[in-house]
């Protein structure tokens, strides 16, 4: 499918078999637990031998033949970022490429009917127009305010669907050989081999030329700076391109769910500098005793020496950058701790660890809580409160950090930093933990991710529910059968777990969840109105 994708595409995703994804989804634990509760019809998929027969002969209903034969790709051509009132809106220019391996005459009525139904779901009050440009017919569904579009064309066995005509025309030009394609890209081929794309359900790729652009788009979210500063964006993009190479993704079934694997390629010099400091400590993370078991998300940093790792990242990256880019990178790196009221990250990290976690107690929480074991309490009080004797005294005492919208507390050899109401919740949990000896669900998460330098657990209920809701919108299914039972089932879902480690080529991330990235992609196609 890379033969149809523009060589300069920002993001490229592909799937070579729809039905393999469908089979993986219906075999997950979450599917079998929830589909009846959510009113999803049980439509059996053809077996593997029947799929091969349909693919080879083309015998069967046309929709089934298309599903059995189709390969699909998604390309993002531009981010489409616009600034308004100090907020950044991202509206990517993108297209879906569907290679049906079936004649245009056979697929056209089926494809047009499917697109009509999709437009009716995706755009309320959509109107249809057709026009021809250079012997190519474009089918366009537009929202009443013309703010949204679905544009499609059929060229032989290839169907191209985009969110504007330019995206569709760009991909059409690639198919006709008028623009270079992505197929021969060396980084793409290397990423395919590394992530074993041929054995995966789906594969994704961002070239080194474009990874910096994506980093620069996300930087304002980390630093808290106003979006739209072109000079800042260019500095971030230029700096990122000197340390970050291509980015890849693959997906496959695993342990009753879906595992997503990501690779962020780093320069060999940076990998060798970081390797000695990215060793995961094996100690039990006692700081989890102050975290509620129903927490929305928690990230555990298990480095043997957090300060040494911080320094290694700073110096390792700085050696690859010019002076100005180094200053910008350092400010971005520090921003992660500045949000907790920590103005001096170096001295802070000298006084805490090796156990460090960040946690969001509730989904709606705007800020996280940072919790760490204390190495030098007097020095830490100096960092936080400006004097070694300052700050909260005694157990379960909370005190605001001067000049910051955050607070701190010391309990059982740990420091807690974050919004005051969240700290009081954690302190209450610490008191309960002293009376209980049960194995917490979070302890199981830490045990199962012991080899990773960074591990994150996130409640998966929202993504599972959104996936099924999107599926219901797509199929026109009924309402959930039992809301109370559904709520209980959602509460019992296992955490989505992400493990991050430093591998041979760069940063590797593995995420085990109910439906993987497919749980996020389907709601994008069938959003809530």
Task: List the predicted regions and their residue ranges.
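Short, surface-exposed beta-strand/loop micro-motifs that present aromatic residues
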Residues: 74-87, 147-156, 357-361, 404-412, ...
């Amino acid at each position: 499918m890379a033969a149809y994708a523009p060589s300069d595409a920002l993001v490229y995703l592909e799937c070579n078999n729809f039905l393999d994804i469908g089979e993986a989804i219906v075999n997950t634990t979450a599917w079998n637990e929830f589909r009846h509760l959510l009113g999803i019809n049980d439509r059996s998929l053809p077996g593997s031998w029947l799929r091969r027969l349909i693919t080879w002969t083309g015998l069967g209903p046309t929709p089934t033949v298309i599903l059995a034969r189709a390969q699909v790709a998604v390309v993002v051509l531009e981010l489409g970022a616009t600034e308004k009132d100090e907020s950044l809106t991202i509206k990517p220019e993108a297209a879906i490429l569907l290679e049906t391996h079936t004649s245009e005459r056979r697929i056209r009525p089926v494809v047009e009917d499917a697109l009509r139904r999709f437009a009716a779901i995706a755009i309320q009050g959509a109107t249809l127009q057709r026009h021809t440009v250079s012997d190519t017919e474009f089918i366009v569904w537009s929202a009443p305010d013309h703010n949204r579009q679905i544009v499609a064309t059929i060229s032989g066995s290839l169907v191209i669907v985009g969110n504007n005509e330019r995206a569709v025309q760009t991909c059409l030009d690639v198919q006709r050989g008028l623009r270079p394609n992505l197929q021969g890209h060396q980084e793409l081929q290397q990423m395919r081999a590394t992530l074993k794309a041929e054995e995966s359900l789906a594969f994704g790729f961002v070239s080194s030329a474009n990874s910096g652009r994506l980093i620069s788009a996300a930087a304002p979210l980390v630093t808290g700076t106003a979006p739209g500063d072109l000079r800042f964006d260019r500095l971030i993009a230029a700096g990122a391109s000197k340390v970050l190479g291509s980015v890849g993704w693959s997906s496959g079934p695993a342990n009753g769910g879906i595992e997503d694997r990501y690779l962020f390629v780093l320069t060999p010099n940076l990998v060798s500098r970081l390797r000695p400091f990215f060793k995961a400590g094996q100690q039990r993370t006692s700081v989890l005793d102050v975290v509620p078991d129903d927490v929305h998300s928690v990230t555990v940093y298990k480095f043997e020496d957090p300060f040494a790792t911080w320094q290694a990242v700073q110096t390792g990256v700085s050696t690859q950058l010019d002076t100005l880019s180094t200053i910008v990178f350092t400010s971005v790196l520090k921003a992660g701790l500045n949000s907790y009221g920590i103005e001096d990250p170096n001295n802070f990290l000298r006084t805490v660890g090796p156990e460090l976690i960040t946690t969001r107690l509730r989904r709606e929480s705007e800020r996280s809580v940072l919790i760490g074991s204390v190495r030098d309490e007097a020095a830490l009080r100096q960092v936080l409160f400006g004097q070694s004797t300052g700050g909260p005294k005694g157990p379960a005492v909370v005190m605001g950090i001067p000049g910051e919208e955050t607070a701190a507390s010391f309990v059982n050899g740990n420091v807690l930093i974050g919004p005051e109401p969240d700290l009081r919740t954690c302190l209450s949990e610490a008191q309960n933990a002293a009376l209980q000896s049960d194995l917490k669900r979070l302890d199981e998460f830490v045990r199962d991710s012991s080899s990773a330098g960074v591990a994150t657990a996130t409640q998966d209920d929202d993504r599972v529910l959104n996936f099924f809701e999107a599926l219901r919108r797509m199929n026109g299914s009924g309402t959930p059968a039992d809301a109370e039972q559904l709520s209980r089932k959602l509460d019992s879902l296992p955490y989505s777990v992400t493990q991050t480690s430093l591998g041979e080529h760069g940063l590797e991330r593995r995420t085990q969840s109910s439906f993987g990235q497919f749980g996020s992609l389907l709601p994008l196609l069938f959003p809530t109105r």
